[in-house]
């Protein structure tokens, strides 16, 4: 039985997700920024359905999260997906934006950080995202650090992703996570991946090849009293990956140009991502779809392994 508070006044559960949590089925939370900001309509809705299908194929239930009418949507119906995909101007909601958007009663597309807030409130221990935010290059001057990293220290949710984007300072990102005692586990890989690239050039703190051992590690982390996330990474499929050196060269050149044009803060990330997409002649589109699907599938697999592990523990 779930410990979820289904009467929480800030949560609106879909019937499917409510039943799954109530009966102890594995559930995977998903963000809605990819729907409202990632792709044009109707491609965005079709992509969201593919991501949900990848979770279902592994035996888990997807719970796409959004904000509407003063509550978090925990799981979206087809009508919800269509509305979020076709409505223009939905603001991107990170952790700091949640109270204002909830109070105004408007719509909000959840990021990694805000999705973790909702997943934790809803009692969903797994979340999938293609890639996380991190410490930006030049953060020693700008102090530009993604809210994702801060939220990892506050939410008891296992985050499955393909690492962080190469446009970030991945060395400092890993240092920050180490300082905050956030475990990093790379599934069937020795390296910390970098979204489009199979390796960031940095060795992962832990490699685990067994889903049950990962499930046990997550359980141990929370049994120790930690209130933070566990980060589980898995690299993009080799056939869809873009070379690390190629991407790094593009980013360095684009970063210089961005600085010259005075592009900083929130505008820097989309600027650099567009530069990579243009220079690789659209290879990033295929790569992005690949990591969206593969991380969702792995999250579904690990959520099932976690449920099985907990059931075995309860029977012991």
Curated annotation (Swiss-Prot):
Any one GO BP annotation for this protein: nucleobase catabolic process
Effect of deleting the gene: The mutant shows lower tolerance to oxidative stress. It exhibits a decreased ability to cause systemic disease on potted S.ionantha.
Pfam family, one: Indigoidine_A
Note on cofactor: Binds 1 Mn(2+) ion per subunit.
Needed co-factor(s): Mn(2+)
Annotated family: Belongs to the pseudouridine-5'-phosphate glycosidase family.
Name of this protein: Pseudouridine-5'-phosphate glycosidase
Organism: Dickeya dadantii (strain 3937) (Erwinia chrysanthemi (strain 3937))
Lineage: Bacteria, Pseudomonadati, Pseudomonadota, Gammaproteobacteria, Enterobacterales
């Amino acid at each position: 039985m779930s410990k979820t508070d289904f009467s929480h006044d800030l949560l609106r559960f879909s019937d499917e997700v409510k039943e799954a949590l109530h009966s102890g089925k594995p559930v995977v939370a998903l963000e809605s920024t990819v729907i409202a900001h990632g792709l044009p309509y109707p491609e965005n809705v079709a992509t969201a359905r593919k991501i949900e299908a990848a979770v279902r194929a592994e035996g888990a239930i997807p719970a796409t999260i959004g904000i509407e009418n003063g509550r978090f949507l925990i799981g979206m119906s087809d009508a919800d997906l269509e509305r979020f995909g076709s409505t223009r101007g939905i603001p991107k909601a990170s952790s700091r934006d949640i109270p204002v958007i909830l109070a105004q009663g408007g719509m909000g597309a959840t990021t990694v950080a805000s999705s973790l807030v909702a997943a934790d409130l809803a009692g969903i221990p797994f979340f999938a995202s293609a890639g996380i935010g991190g410490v930006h290059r030049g953060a020693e001057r700008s102090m530009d650090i993604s809210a994702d990293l801060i939220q990892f220290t506050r939410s008891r949710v296992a985050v499955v992703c393909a690492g962080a984007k190469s446009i970030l300072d991945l060395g400092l990102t890993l240092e920050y996570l180490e300082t905050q005692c956030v475990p990093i586990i790379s599934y069937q890989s020795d390296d910390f991946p970098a979204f489009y690239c199979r390796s960031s050039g940095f060795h992962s703190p832990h490699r685990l090849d067994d889903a049950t051992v990962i499930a046990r590690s997550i359980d141990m982390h929370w049994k120790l009293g930690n209130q933070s996330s566990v980060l589980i990474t898995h690299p993009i499929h080799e056939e869809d990956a873009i070379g690390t050196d190629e991407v790094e060269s593009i980013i360095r050149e684009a970063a210089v140009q961005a600085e010259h044009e005075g592009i900083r803060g929130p505008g820097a990330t989309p600027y650099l991502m567009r530069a990579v997409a243009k220079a690789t002649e659209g290879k990033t589109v295929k790569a992005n779809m690949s990591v969206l699907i593969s991380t969702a599938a792995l999250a579904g697999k690990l959520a099932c392994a976690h449920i099985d592990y907990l059931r075995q523990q309860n029977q012991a």
